[in-house]
Amino acid sequence: MTDDVTGSVADAVNEAMADVVDPSLGFDNELAGLLGNKAKVALIVTRLASAELLAAFCQLSDISAACIGANQGAVAVLKNLDGDGPEAAAKDLTTVVSGMAVILAVNRADKLEVAMYVQGEAGQSFAPPVLFTSTPRFVEDLMLGIVTLNQLKTQGFEVVDSAGLDHDQAMQILANHTKRGRGGRGSRIE
């Protein structure tokens, strides 16, 4: 009888810890996330029409991200979560794509931070609920760890990895999304 009780207690502890520590991340990564040295998740939210276009912009800005398409705007799930990597990505993207405003949402040590970036500068910060009311539902779910990128893929969301594009492919995507790229003069990129 004692073994059954011990076994059930151990199972209960393991089940409770599964919510706290994701074994796929490893102990060091999980500890860095809890201490705030590494973000648990960071998203760049845009008003761009497609995941492919956002992935092209990320590739040209040297940002490693998985970009998800949505009606309200494409979202980049950043891969560099160390230190100020997410903030640097938002600065780089809005510097390379002049005039584009993005929203950076970061979950660091279970604290959600949301700020707008324009022209390479951090602007207004605001409460996460404000972001969640104007973005696809999966943004909140990703930020809180309720859903994973793989789950979104299986649900049919368009996901494009910026690392899967080279410079020429990114430039061709830009050409395809511009007025001139739809068959007008100068639509080819050599």
What is each PLM-predicted segment?
Residues 1-29:
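Acidic, serine/threonine-rich intrinsically disordered low-complexity regions
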Residues 14, 18, 59, 95-98, ...:
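Generic surface-pattern signal
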Residues 25-149:
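Hydrophobic alpha-helical segments that drive targeting, anchoring, or assembly
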Residues 119-124, 129-190:
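Long, compositionally biased intrinsically disordered terminal regions
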